[in-house]
């Protein structure tokens, strides 16, 4: 919950900056940080999310996994699976954006697979799902998300 709150603050700050200095249509490509740099990855995911907001007006829901080198990785992974699964089960309203990203791209794809199980076809129309990961995981995640009717966006972390 803290992460979402801090993201909302970061997003609000970015919105204020945009009013002062409009961003070019051709936004600069963001470069993914080193695989094990947890703090830099959090900032990177927030920046990519802001660039991909589109018409989404609500603060996005960010699901992030720490690097696999984190000694508590498995526990953090299990908690995020539970959190994302519960959120999907409650339903996601149109106009919202879900952001999934991690240097542990394959594990994030596993998390998305678990969270989206049981989601009714076309029940997420008007929802934007952003996956930030490795190109090798894109097709798998897209095949999981597409039946829900959500708008799927992939950004390669490179």
Show the residue positions of the predicted features.
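General marker for long, soluble alpha-helical cores
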Residues: 47, 51-56, 64
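C-terminal partner/receptor-binding element of secreted or periplasmic proteins
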Residues: 132-158
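Mature extracytoplasmic domains of secretory-pathway proteins
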Residues: 63-124
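Bacterial signal peptide processing site
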Residues: 14-17
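Bacterial N-terminal signal peptides that target proteins for export
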Residues: 1-2
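Extracytosolic low-complexity repeat regions of secreted or lipid-anchored proteins
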Residues: 114-141
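Post-signal peptide N-terminal segment of mature Sec-exported envelope proteins
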Residues: 22-44
């Amino acid at each position: 919950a803290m992460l979402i709150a801090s993201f909302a603050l970061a997003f609000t700050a970015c919105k204020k900056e945009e009013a002062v200095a409009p961003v070019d249509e051709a936004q600069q490509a963001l470069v993914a940080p080193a695989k094990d740099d947890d703090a830099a990855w959090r900032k990177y995911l927030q920046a990519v999310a802001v660039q991909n907001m589109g018409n989404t007006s609500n603060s996005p829901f960010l699901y992030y996994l720490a690097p696999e080198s984190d000694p508590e990785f498995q526990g953090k992974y299990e908690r995020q699976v539970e959190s994302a699964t519960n959120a999907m089960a409650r339903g996601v309203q149109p106009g919202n954006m879900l952001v999934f990203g991690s240097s542990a791209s394959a594990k994030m794809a596993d998390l998305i697979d678990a969270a989206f199980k049981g989601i009714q076809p076309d029940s997420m129309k008007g929802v934007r799902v952003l996956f930030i990961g490795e190109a090798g995981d894109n097709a798998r995640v897209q095949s999981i998300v597409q039946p829900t009717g959500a708008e799927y966006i992939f950004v390669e972390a490179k």
